Amino acid sequence: MPRAAKSSRKKDPNTPKRNMSAFMFFSIENREKMKTDNPDATFGQLGSLLGKRWKELTSTEREPYEEKARQDKERYERERKEYDTKLANGEKTGKASAPAAAAAAKEE
């Protein structure tokens, strides 16, 4: 007997974007250089090389990326708080879900 397809919950497009880690900021900044230095490397291999390079950094070299990560975390927490407040106040944050739209249509 085939499994029934799970209905996944639609993600609200207005949900704040998650905060990035210090390593992600490092990866974004260094991926292109790593790609030119290793032109035959696959995406996964580049990730491994970036991870190895990240582990070799001193705490002083990591600091700018960690600062960016702290600032991004503050941004995320601020935006998430605003988003949660809007939800609690009943403000619409995006398109209505299918069940909510069906219920609204049924009431009319």
Curated annotation (Swiss-Prot):
Stretches for region Disordered: 1-20, 61-108
Localization in the cell: Nucleus; Chromosome
Nucleus is among the record's keywords: yes
Keywords for the protein's UniProt record, in alphabetical order: Chromosome, DNA damage, DNA repair, DNA-binding, Nucleus, Transcription, Transcription regulation
Biased composition (Low complexity): 96-108
SMART domains in UniProt: HMG
Name of the protein this chain belongs to: Non-histone chromosomal protein 6
Native species: Schizosaccharomyces pombe (strain 972 / ATCC 24843)
Gene label: nhp6
